[in-house]
Amino acid sequence: MKNRLIALLLLFTVIIFSGAQAQTTARKFEAGKNTFLLDGKPFVVKAAELHYTRIPQAYWDHRIEMCKALGMNTICIYIFWNIHEQEEGKFDFSGQNDIAAFCRTAQKHGMYVIVRPGPYVCAEWE
Protein backbone atom coordinates (compact mmCIF):
# COMPACT_ATOMS: atom_id res chain seq x y z
CA MET A 1 0.00 0.00 0.00
CA LYS A 2 2.85 2.36 0.85
CA ASN A 3 4.46 1.67 -2.56
CA ARG A 4 1.19 2.43 -4.31
CA LEU A 5 0.88 5.73 -2.46
CA ILE A 6 4.43 6.70 -3.42
CA ALA A 7 3.82 5.72 -7.04
CA LEU A 8 0.57 7.70 -7.08
CA LEU A 9 2.28 10.80 -5.69
CA LEU A 10 5.05 10.48 -8.28
CA LEU A 11 2.49 10.06 -11.03
CA PHE A 12 0.53 13.15 -10.02
CA THR A 13 3.78 15.10 -9.77
CA VAL A 14 4.62 14.12 -13.35
CA ILE A 15 1.13 15.03 -14.55
CA ILE A 16 1.14 18.37 -12.74
CA PHE A 17 4.59 19.34 -14.00
CA SER A 18 3.85 18.19 -17.55
CA GLY A 19 0.75 20.38 -17.55
CA ALA A 20 2.58 23.30 -15.97
CA GLN A 21 5.20 23.27 -18.71
CA ALA A 22 2.62 23.32 -21.49
CA GLN A 23 0.36 25.95 -19.94
CA THR A 24 1.79 29.38 -19.26
CA THR A 25 -1.13 30.97 -17.41
CA ALA A 26 -2.62 29.77 -14.15
CA ARG A 27 -6.23 28.59 -14.30
CA LYS A 28 -8.72 28.80 -11.45
CA PHE A 29 -11.46 26.17 -11.09
CA GLU A 30 -13.99 26.56 -8.29
CA ALA A 31 -17.53 25.74 -7.28
CA GLY A 32 -19.81 28.75 -7.55
CA LYS A 33 -23.23 29.10 -5.95
CA ASN A 34 -25.07 27.13 -8.63
CA THR A 35 -22.37 26.23 -11.13
CA PHE A 36 -18.69 25.48 -11.60
CA LEU A 37 -16.49 28.43 -12.49
CA LEU A 38 -13.39 28.35 -14.66
CA ASP A 39 -11.41 31.58 -14.45
CA GLY A 40 -14.49 33.22 -12.94
CA LYS A 41 -16.82 32.22 -15.81
CA PRO A 42 -19.57 29.55 -15.66
CA PHE A 43 -18.24 26.18 -16.83
CA VAL A 44 -20.16 23.00 -17.59
CA VAL A 45 -18.10 19.80 -17.43
CA LYS A 46 -19.05 17.74 -20.49
CA ALA A 47 -17.11 14.55 -20.00
CA ALA A 48 -16.44 11.37 -21.92
CA GLU A 49 -14.97 8.24 -20.34
CA LEU A 50 -11.92 6.79 -22.09
CA HIS A 51 -9.81 3.87 -20.93
CA TYR A 52 -6.32 4.65 -22.22
CA THR A 53 -5.13 1.11 -21.47
CA ARG A 54 -7.82 -0.32 -23.78
CA ILE A 55 -6.95 2.02 -26.67
CA PRO A 56 -3.69 1.52 -28.60
CA GLN A 57 -1.53 4.59 -28.07
CA ALA A 58 -1.51 5.29 -31.82
CA TYR A 59 -5.30 5.89 -31.62
CA TRP A 60 -5.34 8.22 -28.59
CA ASP A 61 -5.42 11.37 -30.75
CA HIS A 62 -8.28 10.02 -32.86
CA ARG A 63 -10.43 8.98 -29.87
CA ILE A 64 -9.89 12.32 -28.14
CA GLU A 65 -10.73 14.18 -31.36
CA MET A 66 -13.96 12.15 -31.62
CA CYS A 67 -14.91 13.12 -28.06
CA LYS A 68 -14.23 16.76 -28.81
CA ALA A 69 -16.30 16.54 -32.02
CA LEU A 70 -19.21 15.31 -29.87
CA GLY A 71 -18.99 18.51 -27.82
CA MET A 72 -17.04 17.14 -24.86
CA ASN A 73 -14.52 19.34 -23.04
CA THR A 74 -13.25 16.79 -20.50
CA ILE A 75 -11.96 13.21 -20.53
CA CYS A 76 -12.42 11.02 -17.44
CA ILE A 77 -9.92 8.21 -16.90
CA TYR A 78 -9.47 5.48 -14.33
CA ILE A 79 -6.05 4.30 -13.23
CA PHE A 80 -6.15 0.51 -13.44
CA TRP A 81 -3.60 -0.51 -10.81
CA ASN A 82 -3.50 -4.15 -11.92
CA ILE A 83 -2.13 -2.93 -15.27
CA HIS A 84 0.45 -0.58 -13.78
CA GLU A 85 1.55 -2.88 -10.94
CA GLN A 86 1.28 -6.42 -12.30
CA GLU A 87 3.99 -7.50 -9.91
CA GLU A 88 4.07 -6.03 -6.42
CA GLY A 89 6.46 -3.10 -6.21
CA LYS A 90 7.15 -2.99 -9.98
CA PHE A 91 5.31 -0.19 -11.76
CA ASP A 92 4.85 0.27 -15.49
CA PHE A 93 3.88 3.71 -16.79
CA SER A 94 5.43 3.25 -20.22
CA GLY A 95 3.96 3.00 -23.71
CA GLN A 96 0.22 2.45 -23.63
CA ASN A 97 0.32 2.73 -19.81
CA ASP A 98 1.83 6.25 -19.89
CA ILE A 99 -0.83 8.27 -18.07
CA ALA A 100 1.14 11.52 -18.33
CA ALA A 101 1.43 11.10 -22.12
CA PHE A 102 -2.31 10.48 -22.37
CA CYS A 103 -3.02 13.63 -20.33
CA ARG A 104 -0.64 15.66 -22.51
CA THR A 105 -2.40 14.32 -25.61
CA ALA A 106 -5.77 15.42 -24.22
CA GLN A 107 -4.31 18.81 -23.34
CA LYS A 108 -2.94 19.15 -26.88
CA HIS A 109 -6.54 18.88 -28.10
CA GLY A 110 -7.78 21.48 -25.60
CA MET A 111 -9.41 18.91 -23.33
CA TYR A 112 -9.36 18.70 -19.53
CA VAL A 113 -8.77 15.39 -17.72
CA ILE A 114 -10.36 14.04 -14.55
CA VAL A 115 -8.14 11.27 -13.14
CA ARG A 116 -9.71 8.67 -10.85
CA PRO A 117 -7.00 6.60 -9.18
CA GLY A 118 -9.08 3.71 -7.82
CA PRO A 119 -8.48 1.09 -6.46
CA TYR A 120 -12.16 0.54 -7.29
CA VAL A 121 -13.07 1.13 -10.92
CA CYS A 122 -16.56 0.83 -12.29
CA ALA A 123 -15.50 -0.32 -15.74
CA GLU A 124 -16.03 -4.08 -16.01
CA TRP A 125 -12.34 -4.57 -15.31
CA GLU A 126 -10.73 -7.56 -13.62
Which sequence ranges carry the predicted segments?
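A generic secondary-structure micro-motif detector
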Residues: A26, T53, G89-D92
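Bacterial N-terminal signal peptides
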Residues: A7-I16
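Sec/Tat signal peptide C-region and signal peptidase I cleavage site
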Residues: F17-A22
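Extracellular/periplasmic catalytic domains that process cell-envelope and extracellular macromolecules
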Residues: E30, L37-G40, A69, K108
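Boundary/entry segment of secreted carbohydrate-active catalytic domains
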Residues: G32-R54
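Positively charged n-region of N-terminal signal peptides that target proteins for export
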Residues: M1-L5
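Short acidic, Pro/Gly- and aromatic-enriched capping/linker segments at domain boundaries
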Residues: Q23-T35
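Aromatic-lined substrate-binding rim segments of carbohydrate-active enzymes
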Residues: W60-E126
